[in-house]
A protein has these predicted regions:
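Hydrophobic ligand-binding cavity/cleft-lining segments
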Residues: 1-46
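General beta-strand recognition
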Residues: 21, 56, 65, 77, ...
């Protein structure tokens, strides 16, 4: 049984980063953990996300399961379950990143989504420094 409201949010940001730097920040768990705070990824993840991988993240006692549906040079698609029932799609290129999040949740997804993207932009900016 899904609790919460259906929510949908999309953001596209300009970032001062190469396509490769963006890809690595979205597909390497060690880098994801550096910018996704206060959300915590489960320990023991492989160095790079791969299609079919399922992992959990936690935020204030709420657990989200992420299943990697697709990962390639410019796209990451995740199926979400648990505290968010839906999907999260990422697309990127040189100098930009776009995220589309849809799901049913009690969490304020638009706020969480915006905060995460601005953290990512800040992280990528620090990498360039």
């Amino acid at each position: 049984m899904m609790l919460g409201a259906f929510q949908s949010c999309q953001l596209r940001l300009e970032v001062n980063a190469s396509r490769l730097a963006i890809r690595e920040s979205l597909t390497h768990p060690s880098q994801i953990q550096d910018w996704i705070f206060p959300q915590q990824l489960e320990p023991g993840l492989p160095p790079v996300l791969t299609t079919g991988l399922s992992y959990k993240s936690q935020f204030s006692g709420l657990v989200i399961t992420h299943e990697v549906i697709t990962v390639n040079d410019d796209c990451l698609k995740l199926l979400l379950s648990g505290s968010v029932e839906g999907f999260h799609y990422w697309y990127w290129g040189a100098g930009w990143v776009q995220s589309h999040l849809e799901g049913v949740s009690l969490l304020p997804l638009q706020l969480v989504h915006s905060y995460a993207l601005f953290q990512l932009r800040s992280f990528l900016g620090q990498m360039d420094s």
